[in-house]
Amino acid sequence: MSKLHVVDHPLIQHKLAFIRDKETGSKTFRELVNEVSMLMAYEVTRELQTEEYEVETPISTAKTRILSGKKLGLVPILRAGLGMVESVRNLIPAARVGHIGVYRDPETLQPVEYYCKLPQDIHERELIVLDPMLATGGSAKASIQFIKDRGGTNIRFMCINAAPEGVEELQKAHPDVDIWTCAVDEKLNEKAYIVPGLGDAGDRLFGTK
């Protein structure tokens, strides 16, 4: 079974309070999602491999450490996942960015892929899938499967807010994919919104309804 990591750093919890607040406008909401994503990225990447590296300082030589493992890839789930990409990529400029979009077929209720553009060397990369919310788990589950179908193997899922139902669904479908979130809330309501949640992240990020 995959691990669930709840990142409860005080700075993250402070910013999450205002992300949840319905009075927070779109501009501030975007900024807060950016900031929280950057803070979360420190934890999500904590176990990246490093190797010893010697540099010349202005005074002498120093033995330091640099990244040495697999290259990284970021895969936001459209559209809300776009709000998390910039800050994470600022920390990891060499990371390649793919995009994946899914929608639910109104008749079959099954996830359908409508867009997918991933790095060609996806099988050589450690991948972080980004989406602010993990509600039912349907989009995350399907997106990760589409990524696996194209050769992705080393995958982590990063969200800001999750419902227990979504966590359970994702863990059941992909027990090899660890989940990072800032909060696991009470439940989903009858409309599949997280309670208390933060509303529709895509609408709040981009000012749409």
Swiss-Prot record:
Cofactor binding remark: Binds 1 Mg(2+) ion per subunit. The magnesium is bound as Mg-PRPP.
NCBIfam families: PRK00129.1, upp
Catalysed reactions, as listed in the record: UMP + diphosphate = 5-phospho-alpha-D-ribose 1-diphosphate + uracil
Control of this protein's activity: Allosterically activated by GTP.
Molecular function terms from GO: GTP binding; magnesium ion binding; uracil phosphoribosyltransferase activity
Assigned keywords, A-Z: Allosteric enzyme, Glycosyltransferase, GTP-binding, Magnesium, Nucleotide-binding, Transferase
Protein name as catalogued: Uracil phosphoribosyltransferase
Obligatory cofactor(s): Mg(2+)
Lineage, uppermost ranks: Bacteria, Bacillati, Bacillota, Clostridia, Natranaerobiales
Domain of life of the native organism: Bacteria
Similarity field: Belongs to the UPRTase family.
CDD domains in the cross-refs: PRTases_typeI
